[in-house]
Amino acid sequence: MLLRWHSVIPLFLTMTVALPNTYRTVVEDLPAIPEGWVQGNPPSPETSVRMNLAVGQRNTRTFEQIVLDISTPGHRNYGKHLSRRDLKGLLRPRRETSNLILSWLEESGVPKRSIVDDGDWIHFVISISQAERMLQTRFYYFHDVQDPGISMIRTLKYSVPSRLARHVYMIQPTTKFGKPKKHANSVASLQVIYSSTNATENCNATITPRCLRELYKMGDYVAKPDCRNVIGISGYLDQYARYSDFYKFLELYAPEMKGANFSVAHIGNGQNLQNSTRNSIEASLDIEYALGLSNASAVFYTTSGRGPLVPDLDQPEQEHNSNEPYLDQLHYLLSLPQEALPAVLSTSYGENEQSVPERFSHATCNLFAQLGARGVSVIFSSGDSGVGSSCLTNGKKKITRFNPTFPASCPFVTSVGATFKINPERAIGFSSGGFSDRHSRPVYQNDAVQHYLDKLGDQWKGLYNPKGRGIPDVSAQGANFAIYDHGKVITVSGTSASAPAFAAIIANLNAIRLRANKPVLGYLNPFIYGKGREGFTDIVHGGSKGCVGYSSTNGSTPAVPYASWNATEGWDPVTGVGTPNFRILAKIVQHME
């Protein structure tokens, strides 16, 4: 059903290469150097690199079903979240598989002390010369054509012994090109609308915490802080959460939350510089609304680096990589003991699904599922490109296509679209949605999505995958949020605003459950499409836009006249099942078993 790591095996994985005394299977083979890069000299043979090896899983179906069972209200296992030890035991490969890989690493010269066997993942440090022998490849520096100062060590092809081919799912960094770009266009980028020192309380013009409280029927509810109810905020791309701005925001817009605070967890040398002059709009928005509405304990997870990128027109490699380092953050979180995990994780970043290597996207989605198994509600903004921006596939055959987004397309995250206006709320044009080309439609979504497709008929046929996971799941206000950043009030828009607002509501629902001696909600989607459905207000006005024939980063692109996903009765691919009604949801979750 979901996360079929071995359900689609690329042709190159079946190719074997005859070498002296052995056979090898090519894992990845790029046909050419990616556009925007030039090959330079080989690195020093002594240069060290940290590799991450994803082990092929044997219990995928069992694991998926367990996650669904413990996340479906009414099931006998509902709320029985797994400990780290239980999860690792479930996912740990057969001993012979681990031994086979570990023996290969040691035989290849990988220092035993550098190998970390984490069951379904194995991490190790190796020199370039050893890596070249082990993977039967050559590494080179590759330089950015437009910015020669940016370079990275990569290869175009690597292989493993054929006896290991079904055990080694992925090794990186190898063929994954990409580079850091500061504040690039991500699918959940924020749009600064205007600056003001006196933001209006007119909720049709400016959104504040008070507006959201009234709109989503939260009233004056303020939860008591609970160490079991931590809300985590993801910080990428050199975004820093500034304490001075946060305190001033609470003073102006959420005085009832006076005394709220957040801590910082540094992942992979991530920083949270308080005196930086860099734009910090995303971090300010996320932390101010997550805590301005929830009063939960909060952790800002600041992560350095970037993830791998498969270039497309919206994110061509030479300038526009904004992929985030999900793996670093996920491995860190999953290493934590149960009491240190956040109950809710809100992330306001993403990219076009096709820009992420397919195996990388499946491996990452599996890790999101692991967080869900441990009781974490993983929430992502759906994106800000409507039905798509470039609307063109990035394969050898360039085909006009609506572009779904990732990680919103992962079935084990809850994706949040955007609305605007009140009385009634309306779908906003930039709210990303659609259907995944990588992940099949999960069973909990079948009825809701099929109902929409039946009404859609043949419209947009061939431009999307009708069997794919539908995006988003829910929605919330996403336009003209007042925030305090670098000493001033500004308003911003994007599904980046919708995600932390929705996450705060989930944190408040968790507080109600904990007070009733019940477990936190955990992975949300089976609840949202099931018993929780009546707690959402259906959005039936407005729609998304896109495919206008122009990409903000690459100029002329295919145009699809009147391309849109319309908000309609029931689930739709712009607002999901609708916006939350806290009053109704609170009654549902208080007694839910």
UniProtKB/Swiss-Prot annotation:
Q: Which Pfam families match?
A: Peptidase_S8, Pro-kuma_activ
Positions annotated as active site in the UniProt record: E282 (charge relay system), D286 (charge relay system), S496 (charge relay system)
Identify the main location.
secreted
GO cellular component assignments? extracellular region
Binding-site list for Ca(2+): D538, I539, G570, D572
**What are the top taxonomic ranks of the organism?**
Eukaryota, Fungi, Dikarya, Ascomycota, Pezizomycotina
**Which reaction(s) does its UniProt entry say it catalyses?**
Release of an N-terminal tripeptide from a polypeptide
Give the UniProt record's GO annotations in the biological process aspect. Answer: proteolysis
Please tell me whether the keyword Repeat is annotated for this protein.
Answer: no
Q: What class of enzyme is it?
A: hydrolase
Question: What keyword terms does UniProt attach to this protein?
Answer: Calcium, Glycoprotein, Hydrolase, Metal-binding, Protease, Secreted, Serine protease, Signal, Virulence, Zymogen
Q: Which source organism does the UniProt entry give?
A: Trichophyton verrucosum (strain HKI 0517)
Q: What is its EC number?
A: 3.4.14.10
Q: Which cofactor does this sequence's record say it needs?
A: Ca(2+)
Q: Which PANTHER family match?
A: PROTEASE S8 TRIPEPTIDYL PEPTIDASE I CLN2, TRIPEPTIDYL PEPTIDASE SED3 (AFU_ORTHOLOGUE AFUA_3G08930)
Q: Where is the signal peptide?
A: 1-18
Q: Which InterPro entries match?
A: Peptidase_S8/S53_dom, Peptidase_S8/S53_dom_sf, S53_propep, Sedolisin_dom, Tripeptidyl-peptidase_I
Name-wise, this protein is Probable tripeptidyl-peptidase SED3
- Keyword tRNA-binding listed? The answer is no
Q: Where in the cell is it found?
A: Secreted, Extracellular space
